[in-house]
C-alpha cells in the first residue's frame, strides 16, 4: 500500500501499514443503523470514531513494531502496552487531522442521512480540537511523527480513490436520467396528450385517426416541396454556402493573414504603400480580397507610420479618406 501511494513509512511502522487501509476498516450498509443509534451520545466523536475504532486500527498497524516507538514503553518481557500506544497516538498533534481524514473516507458512498451525521461529527471534532490541547508535540517522537504524517496523507489519497468511481457512476446515471426524461417528453409530445396527460377513448376513436392522416399528408407535402426547391435552387444554395464559408468576419482578419501583412510592412516600413502587383501577391498569400488589404494598410499607416517632413504631400494618404477599423 505504501508503494501504491508513493509513500515510505518509517521502518518501525511499515509492516502493518495495510491494516489502516483495509476494506474492513470502512463502514458497510449494515453498519449504518448502528452508527445512527450510537450517535445519540453526548460525545459522538469519541463514541463513533474515537479511541475504540480508529485507535484500534492504528494500534493494529503498530503492534508488531510498537516496542521501538519510544524507549519508555519497552518492557523487559517484550510485551507491548496497547494502552500506552493508544494514548501516544491520541495525544499526538496530528491525531485530529488523522480523525478528519478517516471520517472523510467513511463519508464516500454513504447515504445522505449518514453523510450529514458524519459532517456533524466532524464539526464536533473541530470544536473538540479547539478545546483539547495535545499533550505531546512534534519532534518528541520522530518515528511516530512520520507515521502520523504518512497515514494522514495515505487516507487523503485513499478517499480520492474511493470517490472517483462514485463520481463517475453518479455522472453516468445523471446522463441516463436526462436521456430517459427527454425520451419520455418526446413520446408524450408525439402522442398529443391532453392537459392531464391522458388521452380519452373518444379522442382516440373520433379524432385520432383524422389527426394522424392529416399529419402524414402534411409531412408528404413538405417533403415534396423540399425536393422541388432543392432541384430548382440546389446549385445556387451550394454556391451561397461556399461563399459564406469563405467570408471572413467583418473587421477581423485571420492571424496568419495579418502576420503576412505585418511581414510585408516591416520590410517596406520606409514606404509602406504596396503596388498593385504587391497587393495581388498578398491576396494570393493571405486569401484576402483587395478591399481588405487596402483597409488594413490604411489603418496601419494612420496608426503606426509617420511620413518624413520632406516626403511629397501627393504621395501621402488622402486625409479625407475613409477610416476603417480592423478589430
Curated annotation (Swiss-Prot):
ELK domain span: 224-244
Q: Name one GO molecular function term.
A: DNA-binding transcription factor activity, RNA polymerase II-specific
Q: What is this protein called?
A: Homeobox protein knotted-1-like 6
**What GO biological process terms are annotated to this protein in UniProt?**
meristem maintenance
How the protein assembles, per its UniProt entry? May form heterodimeric complex with the TALE/BELL protein BLH9/PNY. Interacts with OFP2 and OFP4.
Q: Which family does the record assign?
A: Belongs to the TALE/KNOX homeobox family.
- Location in or out of the cell: Nucleus
Amino acid at each position: 500500500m505504501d508503494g501504491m501511494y508513493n509513500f515510505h513509512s518509517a521502518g518501525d511502522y511499515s509492516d502493518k501499514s495495510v491494516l489502516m487501509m483495509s476494506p474492513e476498516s470502512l463502514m458497510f450498509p449494515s453498519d449504518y443503523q448502528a452508527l445512527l443509534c450510537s450517535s445519540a451520545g453526548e460525545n459522538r466523536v469519541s463514541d463513533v470514531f474515537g479511541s475504540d475504532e480508529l485507535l484500534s486500527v492504528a494500534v493494529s498497524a503498530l503492534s508488531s513494531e510498537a516496542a521501538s516507538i519510544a524507549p519508555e514503553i519497552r518492557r523487559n518481557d517484550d510485551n507491548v502496552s496497547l494502552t500506552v500506544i493508544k494514548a501516544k497516538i491520541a495525544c499526538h498533534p496530528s491525531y485530529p487531522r488523522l480523525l478528519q481524514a478517516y471520517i472523510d473516507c467513511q463519508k464516500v458512498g454513504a447515504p445522505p442521512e449518514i453523510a450529514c451525521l458524519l459532517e456533524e461529527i466532524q464539526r464536533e471534532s473541530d470544536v473538540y480540537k479547539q478545546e483539547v490541547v495535545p499533550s505531546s508535540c512534534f519532534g518528541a517522537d520522530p518515528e511516530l511523527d512520520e507515521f502520523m504524517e504518512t497515514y494522514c496523507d495515505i487516507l487523503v489519497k485513499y478517499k480520492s480513490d474511493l470517490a472517483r468511481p462514485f463520481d463517475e457512476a453518479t455522472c453516468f446515471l445523471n446522463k441516463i436520467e436526462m436521456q430517459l426524461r427527454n425520451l419520455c417528453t418526446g413520446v408524450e409530445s408525439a402522442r398529443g396528450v391532453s392537459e392531464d396527460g391522458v388521452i380519452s377513448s373518444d379522442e382516440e376513436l373520433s379524432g385520432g385517426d383524422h389527426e394522424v392522416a392529416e399529419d402524414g399528408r402534411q409531412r408528404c407535402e413538405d417533403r415534396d416541396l423540399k425536393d422541388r426547391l432543392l432541384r430548382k435552387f440546389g446549385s445556387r444554395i451550394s454556391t451561397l454556402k461556399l461563399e459564406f464559408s469563405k467570408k471572413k468576419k467583418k473587421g477581423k482578419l485571420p492571424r496568419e493573414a495579418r502576420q503576412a501583412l505585418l511581414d510585408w510592412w516591416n520590410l517596406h516600413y520606409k514606404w509602406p504603400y504596396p503596388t498593385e502587383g504587391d497587393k495581388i501577391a498578398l491576396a494570393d498569400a493571405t486569401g484576402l480580397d483587395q478591399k481588405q488589404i487596402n483597409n488594413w494598410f490604411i489603418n496601419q499607416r494612420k496608426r503606426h507610420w509617420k511620413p518624413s517632413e520632406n516626403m511629397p504631400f501627393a504621395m501621402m494618404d488622402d486625409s479625407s479618406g475613409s477610416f476603417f477599423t480592423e478589430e
